[in-house]
Amino acid sequence: MGRIFTRAIVVITMLVGADWAQAASKAELWPRWQKHDPNSRQQIDHSVWESFLKQNVVAPHPSGVNRVRYDGVSPEDQKSLKSYLQALQALAISNYNRDEQKAYWINLYNAFTVDLIISRFPVASIRDINISPGLLARGPWGAKLLTIEGEKLSLDDIEHRVLRPIWRDNRVHYALNCASLGCPNLQPRAYSAGNSEALLEKGAREFINHPRGVSLQKDKLQVSSIYVWFQEDFGHGAADLMEHWQEYAEPALAGALEKYQGGLAHDYDWRLNGVETKP
């Protein structure tokens, strides 16, 4: 089984083209963000983001993909969201402990993504917001629109140069939301030092047990492109990927994965995760 599955992974990886470049970035540490204070007891207030999520995220949604009411966000909520983002950027995040930092970066990424969509709505896909530098760049991920401790950062920086290399926790992929139907769910809760572990576990379980994550379709294993783009985060090969899926799979899926010996296909739905978008 291992040889067949690995061969499928390799073939698929070779097929990933330039169109997916922003999603296939390597984890490359930005050393200055390693600074932290393990003795700090300071807590960051994410209540504004929590309130926004409860008001504007539809969860659960019949499709199994949490949705955002982008077109229904009130002017007051828009203003509060921008104030929250300004407050996060004003923090000296290096003075906080690792748990507070992890929640901070996840919330910053998600809140800023939502703000980008709202400010440019209506859009059919986040990839239509072409503000990243570079001739082949697509989407907003490379645009350095945030300023933290005097440094300009992009969404790509947060994901690939801070969160992934510092924490080395593949569940981060289930926490970051790219405003698309193919993404793991945007949780209706803000991350915090106290709830991050539970939310990361919840996100992994929800995604893997939904068809956009992992599913068997007509004797073919269909998985999210996340597992191709970021295969290195999930281990050294097909066996590690399978072990990861089985760890979170419900009994029926886990049993099917254990017996599976076929090929693999991957895809990703970049349509906006708005309330009106049909699956």
Tell what function each PLM region has:
Residues 19-23:
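Sec/Tat signal peptide C-region and signal peptidase I cleavage site
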Residues 24-279:
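Interaction/scaffold regions that mediate signaling and macromolecular assembly across diverse proteins
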Residues 8-17:
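Bacterial N-terminal signal peptides
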Residues 1-9:
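Bacterial N-terminal signal peptides that target proteins for export
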